Swiss-Prot record:
One of its GO terms (biological process) is positive regulation of Wnt signaling pathway. One of its GO terms (molecular function) is metal ion binding. Residues 12-33, 125-139 have a biased composition (Low complexity). Keywords: Metal-binding, Nucleus, Ubl conjugation, Ubl conjugation pathway, Zinc. Residues 1-78, 118-194, 249-276 are annotated as: Disordered. The lineage of its organism: Eukaryota, Metazoa, Ecdysozoa, Arthropoda, Hexapoda. Pathway: Protein modification; protein ubiquitination. Its main location: nucleus. This is Protein cereblon. Belongs to the CRBN family. Residues 156-177 have a biased composition (Polar residues). GO terms for cellular component: nucleus. InterPro entries: CULT, Lon_prtase_N, Yippee/Mis18/Cereblon.
Amino acid sequence: MDDEETAEIDETSSSSTNTNTNATAMATATETAAEMHVELEQDEEIPQGSENGAGTGAGDGTRAEAGASAIHAETTAHVSSRARLENMIEEVDNMFEEVSELMVDVTELMRRANQLREDAGTGAVPQNPTVATNTTPPAEIEEEEEGPEQQAEQALVNNDSPSQASISSRHSGSDMSLDSPGSEDDSDAEAVPRWMIPANRVRSAVDMLVSQARNRDGGIATLLRRENFLQRVRSMVFSQDRIRGRASDDANNADVINTVPDDTSEASPPPPLDVDMEEGVRFDTNLPAEHSYFGTNLNRVPGVDYLEVGSTHRMLIFMHQHILFPGEVLPFMIDGNIIDEEIEDTGRDGVIFGVGFPLMQPPDDNPHKLYGVTCQIYEKGESGRQHVFYKSRALQRIVINCDDIQGPPQYIARNPTMKCYSKVKILPEYFLPEPLKCIDMGSLNRFRDIPSMQEKFRRFQLTTTPWPVEACGEYSFEHIVEKARQKLEIHKIDTMPKCPIQLSFWLVRNLHLTEKMMRLTFLTDSVNIRLQIIGTTLKHESLFYCRYCNSSLAYCSDLFAMSKHGVQTQYCNSAGYIHETNTVYRVIAHAIGYSGEPSTEFSWFPGYQWHIIICKFCAQHVGWEFKAVEPNLAPKVFFGLAGSSVRIGKTSERTPTHGSRFVVRNLLRLVSRELE
């Protein structure tokens, strides 16, 4: 047992001795008060006897005057004794209140002394039978299998940096609050009584419990369902105090603190896997693009031409929970009468309808706008359940005036049964070619395509133009395309389009921008500006985070293409719900759990079975695991992350506990309420 724990136990014994002394004083005061009551009654009897004696000896004047003087003296003494007695009774009441408060302090001190004894393995301190204490022992924490010493020491190192902490309302006078930074030093420990656990210690203990729960089956949900959660937090506090004390002694003997790595810095992603190294037949990426899970009886539908830029058209519209970019394929299942009636009404072979995105925030100057895309149906097939499978492709960006919508807008993924029409306007796509490529150099043009001469040819072109180098470089996008190609090489994608307009939309889908950047690129009419926005994101490393609890799930560097359309594709399940799916080789260790049983029915990838995966931290659905059921099929296992359940974020957002700060803060609020 260390010195600090011994001092606390001595303090406990001292407090118990003070309690006994105060109780003895209280008993003495009570006896004194009783004696004063007896004296007061005797004093009250003496005046009555004097009055009776004066009545019988009325002839003796001297005795009457003496009796009157005695009565006056006794009355004065009686008043003085009564005042003194009332003061003593008031002092006894105050002593009772002080003793009651001291009993509460002794209860907490005895509880902590018992916990210190149990942690030290020397048994419990004998308790006073008159003191009510909590006899429930703290629940044991399963630390051995996860390496408690290493985890606790690592948590202490991580928590040395400022972080948000929580504290109960009784600590409102301290610097530690729900939204203020905390520290792991002992500067704030003296601001509260010694029996009270400082807020920074509670924060550190909850962080460790969350980290341990993350590495076990059930995740945070199991942690909250377990009994004696508050006792587990207290036990973790004392365990970390012991480890912190040993670490401090080691630091004083040898300067080894600087050699501990800082896990809060941005961690580099692991090297990407190479699926070509796996033995077996490489999966045909053309199969998912065909959406063969709809069946083989799909018929081609004649297409229509692109609509003129700036023109306005009245068409059937639906809503969609994801943002589609031109070139993406949208499979869906709907009542066939809606589309068939549309073909009969328009008298055209092909069908074009609009898809709006409520996720897109309208500009401040016109909040009644809704952005979306036009989609063309190119294949359909019967499902046998009064629904028809359709495959459509997004063509052009549109803007919808909400005041012109006729009918209730319905989501295309929820089996709409009613029609909704509106006027839509086709948005333009402006593209300015590179200025130097517009210069005709005559016979020197033959050197343009020679790699060894391109740089010299470019410098020669710059000398013939009135524009500065910065102006020419502002509209150049070749270096952006080259950087994007190098970054996408690890994803095994070789279907990069050459048209700049299509290329800009294709890069947005395959480079995985944040939602804010996706909105910005969609609202941009200039292809050049769109490519420049994409270029600013090429140097960032990103992760997939759970949208519900912000837990890190997978690195974007592990993305790969299981479809010829790229790493992100829209798929439709048997219920008609459309999922935006991102395929990755692997997920972060201890990041997911499983729900239900695996199945091969309606599999998006022929030859693979799917199994629902959930976030291990919050138990929410985040995607599927696909495992090969056919022999010699590569990759053997991969994962599909649902776009509606994950978000893209920078690697610097990843926390040491692999979870979000608000989860820990909610646990701290729970602990604070229990401590109160």
